[in-house]
Protein backbone atom coordinates (compact mmCIF):
# COMPACT_ATOMS: atom_id res chain seq x y z
CA UNK A 1 0.00 0.00 0.00
CA UNK A 2 1.23 3.49 -0.81
CA UNK A 3 2.36 5.56 2.18
CA UNK A 4 -0.02 8.35 1.11
CA UNK A 5 -3.11 6.11 1.12
CA UNK A 6 -2.54 4.08 4.29
CA UNK A 7 -4.97 4.47 7.23
CA UNK A 8 -3.44 6.43 10.11
CA UNK A 9 -4.79 5.59 13.57
CA UNK A 10 -4.49 8.40 16.13
CA UNK A 11 -2.64 7.61 19.37
CA UNK A 12 -3.58 10.76 21.30
CA UNK A 13 -6.69 12.93 21.59
CA UNK A 14 -4.86 15.80 19.94
CA UNK A 15 -4.00 13.62 16.94
CA UNK A 16 -7.63 12.46 16.79
CA UNK A 17 -8.88 16.08 16.66
CA UNK A 18 -6.27 16.86 13.99
CA UNK A 19 -7.43 13.97 11.78
CA UNK A 20 -11.12 14.85 12.30
CA UNK A 21 -10.44 18.34 10.91
CA UNK A 22 -9.13 16.74 7.71
CA UNK A 23 -12.01 14.32 7.25
CA UNK A 24 -14.48 14.96 4.39
CA UNK A 25 -17.24 17.39 5.36
CA UNK A 26 -20.47 18.59 3.79
CA UNK A 27 -19.16 22.16 3.93
CA UNK A 28 -15.45 21.88 3.26
CA UNK A 29 -12.79 24.08 4.86
CA UNK A 30 -11.33 27.06 3.01
CA UNK A 31 -8.94 25.90 0.29
CA UNK A 32 -5.30 26.49 1.22
CA UNK A 33 -2.53 26.95 -1.33
CA UNK A 34 1.08 25.79 -1.13
CA UNK A 35 3.80 27.74 -2.92
CA UNK A 36 6.86 25.66 -3.80
CA UNK A 37 10.24 26.60 -5.27
CA UNK A 38 11.88 24.29 -7.77
CA UNK A 39 15.50 23.18 -7.55
CA UNK A 40 16.64 25.88 -9.98
CA UNK A 41 14.31 28.79 -9.13
CA UNK A 42 15.83 32.23 -9.72
CA UNK A 43 15.23 35.55 -7.91
CA UNK A 44 12.28 36.56 -10.14
CA UNK A 45 10.35 33.33 -9.52
CA UNK A 46 11.10 33.54 -5.77
CA UNK A 47 9.72 37.10 -5.61
CA UNK A 48 6.58 36.08 -7.51
CA UNK A 49 5.92 33.23 -5.06
CA UNK A 50 6.43 35.58 -2.08
CA UNK A 51 4.05 38.18 -3.53
CA UNK A 52 1.35 35.59 -4.29
CA UNK A 53 1.81 34.27 -0.74
CA UNK A 54 1.26 37.82 0.58
CA UNK A 55 -2.06 37.94 -1.34
CA UNK A 56 -3.08 34.47 -0.12
CA UNK A 57 -2.33 34.95 3.59
CA UNK A 58 -3.50 33.40 5.91
CA UNK A 59 -4.69 30.64 3.52
CA UNK A 60 -1.28 29.74 2.12
CA UNK A 61 1.88 27.79 2.94
CA UNK A 62 5.23 29.02 1.56
CA UNK A 63 7.99 26.40 1.25
CA UNK A 64 11.31 28.23 1.59
CA UNK A 65 13.56 25.29 0.69
CA UNK A 66 14.08 24.26 -2.91
CA UNK A 67 12.45 21.03 -4.08
CA UNK A 68 13.86 19.17 -7.05
CA UNK A 69 10.74 17.96 -8.86
CA UNK A 70 9.10 18.20 -12.28
CA UNK A 71 5.29 18.42 -11.96
CA UNK A 72 4.52 17.41 -15.57
CA UNK A 73 6.67 14.27 -15.33
CA UNK A 74 6.13 13.12 -11.74
CA UNK A 75 3.38 14.41 -9.42
CA UNK A 76 4.04 12.20 -6.37
CA UNK A 77 6.02 14.87 -4.50
CA UNK A 78 3.25 17.45 -5.04
CA UNK A 79 0.64 14.96 -3.81
CA UNK A 80 2.80 14.21 -0.76
CA UNK A 81 3.13 17.91 0.13
CA UNK A 82 -0.61 18.37 -0.48
CA UNK A 83 -1.51 15.70 2.05
CA UNK A 84 1.15 16.83 4.51
CA UNK A 85 0.06 20.49 4.54
CA UNK A 86 -3.66 19.87 3.77
CA UNK A 87 -3.56 22.10 0.67
CA UNK A 88 -5.75 21.55 -2.38
CA UNK A 89 -4.13 24.33 -4.46
CA UNK A 90 -0.50 24.77 -5.45
CA UNK A 91 1.88 27.05 -7.32
CA UNK A 92 5.28 25.73 -8.37
CA UNK A 93 8.06 28.03 -9.60
CA UNK A 94 11.12 27.01 -11.61
CA UNK A 95 13.64 28.38 -14.12
CA UNK A 96 15.70 26.76 -16.87
CA UNK A 97 17.03 27.53 -20.34
CA UNK A 98 14.13 25.84 -22.16
CA UNK A 99 11.38 27.39 -19.98
CA UNK A 100 12.67 30.52 -18.22
CA UNK A 101 10.72 32.11 -15.33
CA UNK A 102 8.22 29.26 -15.19
CA UNK A 103 5.08 28.99 -13.02
CA UNK A 104 2.85 25.93 -12.67
CA UNK A 105 -0.54 26.56 -11.07
CA UNK A 106 -2.86 23.67 -10.24
CA UNK A 107 -5.39 22.07 -7.91
CA UNK A 108 -5.95 18.71 -6.28
CA UNK A 109 -8.90 16.36 -5.97
CA UNK A 110 -8.69 13.74 -3.22
CA UNK A 111 -4.95 14.57 -2.89
CA UNK A 112 -4.30 13.80 -6.57
CA UNK A 113 -3.55 16.37 -9.28
CA UNK A 114 -6.74 17.41 -11.10
CA UNK A 115 -5.75 20.38 -13.28
CA UNK A 116 -2.32 21.86 -13.93
CA UNK A 117 -1.41 24.80 -16.20
CA UNK A 118 2.06 26.11 -16.96
CA UNK A 119 2.61 29.86 -17.37
CA UNK A 120 5.70 31.80 -18.42
CA UNK A 121 6.58 35.13 -16.78
CA UNK A 122 7.51 37.75 -19.39
CA UNK A 123 7.30 40.85 -17.20
CA UNK A 124 7.05 41.27 -13.42
CA UNK A 125 6.66 44.22 -11.03
CA UNK A 126 6.83 43.34 -7.35
CA UNK A 127 4.66 44.54 -4.45
CA UNK A 128 7.65 46.40 -3.00
CA UNK A 129 8.40 48.18 -6.29
CA UNK A 130 4.99 49.92 -6.29
CA UNK A 131 5.12 52.46 -3.45
CA UNK A 132 1.41 52.63 -2.63
CA UNK A 133 -0.66 51.59 0.37
CA UNK A 134 -1.49 47.88 0.63
CA UNK A 135 -4.56 46.00 1.79
CA UNK A 136 -4.59 44.20 5.15
CA UNK A 137 -3.95 40.47 5.36
CA UNK A 138 -6.91 38.17 4.61
CA UNK A 139 -8.89 40.71 2.54
CA UNK A 140 -11.27 39.05 0.08
CA UNK A 141 -10.56 40.26 -3.48
CA UNK A 142 -12.92 41.03 -6.35
CA UNK A 143 -12.01 39.07 -9.50
CA UNK A 144 -12.49 40.55 -12.98
CA UNK A 145 -11.82 38.64 -16.22
CA UNK A 146 -11.60 40.49 -19.53
CA UNK A 147 -11.14 38.95 -22.96
CA UNK A 148 -13.10 36.57 -25.20
CA UNK A 149 -10.53 33.78 -24.83
CA UNK A 150 -11.71 33.07 -21.27
CA UNK A 151 -15.10 32.01 -22.69
CA UNK A 152 -14.08 30.51 -26.05
CA UNK A 153 -10.93 28.39 -25.62
CA UNK A 154 -11.06 25.30 -23.38
CA UNK A 155 -7.56 25.89 -21.94
CA UNK A 156 -8.42 29.49 -21.03
CA UNK A 157 -11.78 28.40 -19.60
CA UNK A 158 -10.04 25.99 -17.24
CA UNK A 159 -7.44 28.63 -16.41
CA UNK A 160 -10.23 31.06 -15.46
CA UNK A 161 -11.83 28.41 -13.23
CA UNK A 162 -8.44 27.65 -11.68
CA UNK A 163 -7.66 31.31 -10.97
CA UNK A 164 -11.10 31.81 -9.36
CA UNK A 165 -10.46 28.76 -7.19
CA UNK A 166 -6.99 30.02 -6.26
CA UNK A 167 -7.82 33.63 -5.31
CA UNK A 168 -11.50 33.58 -4.27
CA UNK A 169 -10.84 33.29 -0.53
CA UNK A 170 -13.47 32.32 2.07
CA UNK A 171 -17.17 32.07 1.20
CA UNK A 172 -19.21 34.73 3.03
CA UNK A 173 -22.94 35.43 3.19
CA UNK A 174 -22.78 39.24 3.32
CA UNK A 175 -20.22 41.85 2.26
CA UNK A 176 -20.18 45.45 3.45
CA UNK A 177 -19.26 48.21 1.02
CA UNK A 178 -16.11 49.20 2.93
CA UNK A 179 -14.95 45.57 2.72
CA UNK A 180 -14.50 45.82 -1.06
CA UNK A 181 -10.89 46.95 -0.87
CA UNK A 182 -8.99 45.49 -3.81
CA UNK A 183 -9.41 44.03 -7.30
CA UNK A 184 -7.52 41.32 -9.17
CA UNK A 185 -7.86 41.94 -12.91
CA UNK A 186 -7.02 39.28 -15.52
CA UNK A 187 -6.95 40.21 -19.22
CA UNK A 188 -6.49 37.69 -22.05
CA UNK A 189 -5.24 39.48 -25.17
CA UNK A 190 -3.15 38.32 -28.16
CA UNK A 191 -2.08 35.07 -26.52
CA UNK A 192 -1.00 36.71 -23.25
CA UNK A 193 -2.55 36.98 -19.78
CA UNK A 194 -2.11 40.31 -17.98
CA UNK A 195 -2.45 40.05 -14.20
CA UNK A 196 -2.96 43.35 -12.35
CA UNK A 197 -3.82 44.17 -8.74
CA UNK A 198 -5.56 47.40 -7.74
CA UNK A 199 -6.62 48.94 -4.45
CA UNK A 200 -10.15 50.36 -4.40
CA UNK A 201 -10.47 53.94 -3.13
CA UNK A 202 -13.92 55.24 -2.17
CA UNK A 203 -14.07 59.03 -2.66
CA UNK A 204 -16.76 61.57 -1.82
CA UNK A 205 -19.19 62.13 -4.69
CA UNK A 206 -21.83 64.44 -3.21
CA UNK A 207 -24.43 61.65 -3.19
CA UNK A 208 -25.03 58.38 -1.37
CA UNK A 209 -23.01 56.26 -3.83
CA UNK A 210 -19.27 56.97 -3.48
CA UNK A 211 -16.95 57.72 -6.39
CA UNK A 212 -14.56 54.83 -7.08
CA UNK A 213 -10.90 55.19 -8.03
CA UNK A 214 -8.37 52.42 -8.69
CA UNK A 215 -4.79 52.64 -7.44
CA UNK A 216 -2.24 50.05 -8.59
CA UNK A 217 -1.08 48.01 -5.63
CA UNK A 218 0.98 45.19 -7.14
CA UNK A 219 2.09 42.62 -8.04
CA UNK A 220 1.90 43.03 -11.82
CA UNK A 221 2.55 40.09 -14.17
CA UNK A 222 2.58 39.54 -17.93
CA UNK A 223 2.10 35.80 -18.51
CA UNK A 224 2.05 33.49 -21.50
CA UNK A 225 0.35 30.08 -21.62
CA UNK A 226 2.65 27.06 -22.03
CA UNK A 227 1.82 23.42 -21.24
CA UNK A 228 -1.46 22.12 -19.77
CA UNK A 229 -2.50 18.99 -17.90
CA UNK A 230 -6.31 18.99 -17.69
CA UNK A 231 -8.62 16.44 -16.10
CA UNK A 232 -11.00 14.44 -18.27
CA UNK A 233 -14.62 15.60 -18.50
CA UNK A 234 -15.85 12.69 -16.34
CA UNK A 235 -13.30 13.33 -13.57
CA UNK A 236 -13.97 17.07 -13.73
CA UNK A 237 -17.74 16.48 -13.31
CA UNK A 238 -17.06 14.09 -10.42
CA UNK A 239 -14.95 16.71 -8.64
CA UNK A 240 -17.79 19.25 -9.04
CA UNK A 241 -20.49 16.88 -7.76
CA UNK A 242 -22.54 18.24 -4.87
CA UNK A 243 -23.46 15.97 -1.92
CA UNK A 244 -27.13 14.96 -1.69
CA UNK A 245 -27.44 16.51 1.77
CA UNK A 246 -26.55 19.97 0.36
CA UNK A 247 -28.95 19.81 -2.58
CA UNK A 248 -32.10 21.89 -1.98
CA UNK A 249 -35.19 19.74 -1.44
CA UNK A 250 -37.89 20.07 -4.08
CA UNK A 251 -41.13 21.59 -2.82
CA UNK A 252 -44.30 20.27 -4.42
CA UNK A 253 -46.75 22.55 -6.23
CA UNK A 254 -44.42 25.58 -6.00
CA UNK A 255 -42.96 27.35 -9.02
CA UNK A 256 -41.00 30.56 -9.68
CA UNK A 257 -41.07 32.89 -12.64
CA UNK A 258 -38.15 34.82 -14.18
CA UNK A 259 -38.67 37.72 -11.76
CA UNK A 260 -38.42 35.50 -8.68
CA UNK A 261 -42.14 35.57 -7.82
CA UNK A 262 -43.32 32.42 -6.05
CA UNK A 263 -46.50 30.70 -7.23
CA UNK A 264 -48.28 27.96 -5.27
CA UNK A 265 -50.98 25.49 -6.30
CA UNK A 266 -53.64 24.49 -3.74
CA UNK A 267 -55.76 21.34 -4.20
CA UNK A 268 -59.34 21.64 -2.81
CA UNK A 269 -62.53 19.57 -3.00
CA UNK A 270 -65.24 20.64 -5.43
CA UNK A 271 -67.53 23.15 -3.75
CA UNK A 272 -71.35 23.14 -4.13
CA UNK A 273 -72.05 26.68 -5.27
CA UNK A 274 -75.83 26.30 -4.82
CA UNK A 275 -75.32 26.37 -1.04
CA UNK A 276 -73.12 29.45 -1.18
CA UNK A 277 -74.49 32.26 1.00
CA UNK A 278 -74.97 35.44 -1.03
CA UNK A 279 -76.05 38.93 -0.14
CA UNK A 280 -79.80 39.19 0.49
CA UNK A 281 -80.94 41.72 -2.07
CA UNK A 282 -84.50 42.44 -3.16
CA UNK A 283 -83.64 41.67 -6.75
CA UNK A 284 -82.38 38.19 -5.79
CA UNK A 285 -85.44 37.20 -3.75
CA UNK A 286 -87.34 34.20 -5.10
CA UNK A 287 -90.77 34.80 -6.58
CA UNK A 288 -93.83 32.83 -5.40
CA UNK A 289 -93.96 30.85 -8.67
CA UNK A 290 -90.32 29.75 -8.24
CA UNK A 291 -90.98 28.65 -4.66
CA UNK A 292 -93.97 26.52 -5.74
CA UNK A 293 -91.91 24.74 -8.43
CA UNK A 294 -89.09 24.08 -5.90
CA UNK A 295 -91.58 22.62 -3.39
CA UNK A 296 -92.99 20.30 -6.08
CA UNK A 297 -89.48 19.10 -7.00
CA UNK A 298 -88.63 18.35 -3.35
CA UNK A 299 -91.89 16.40 -2.88
CA UNK A 300 -91.27 14.33 -6.02
CA UNK A 301 -87.74 13.46 -4.80
CA UNK A 302 -89.13 12.28 -1.42
CA UNK A 303 -91.73 10.10 -3.12
CA UNK A 304 -89.06 8.47 -5.32
CA UNK A 305 -86.89 7.72 -2.28
CA UNK A 306 -89.80 6.11 -0.43
Curated annotation (Swiss-Prot):
InterPro entries: Brix, Rpf2. GO terms for biological process: maturation of LSU-rRNA from tricistronic rRNA transcript (SSU-rRNA, 5.8S rRNA, LSU-rRNA); protein localization to nucleolus; regulation of signal transduction by p53 class mediator; ribosomal large subunit assembly; ribosomal large subunit biogenesis. Residues 270-306 are annotated as: Disordered. Keywords: Nucleus, Ribosome biogenesis. The keyword Zinc does not apply. It is found in: Nucleus, Nucleolus. It comes from the Eukaryota. The keyword Nucleus applies. It holds the Pfam family Brix. Residues 31-234 form the Brix domain. GO terms for molecular function: 5S rRNA binding; RNA binding; rRNA binding. GO terms for cellular component: chromosome; nucleolus; nucleoplasm. Residues 287-298 have a biased composition (Basic and acidic residues). Residues 277-286 have a biased composition (Basic residues). Component of a hexameric 5S RNP precursor complex, composed of 5S RNA, RRS1, RPF2/BXDC1, RPL5, RPL11 and HEATR3; this complex acts as a precursor for ribosome assembly. PANTHER family: BRIX DOMAIN CONTAINING PROTEIN, RIBOSOME PRODUCTION FACTOR 2 HOMOLOG. Belongs to the RPF2 family. Involved in ribosomal large subunit assembly. May regulate the localization of the 5S RNP/5S ribonucleoprotein particle to the nucleolus. This is Ribosome production factor 2 homolog.
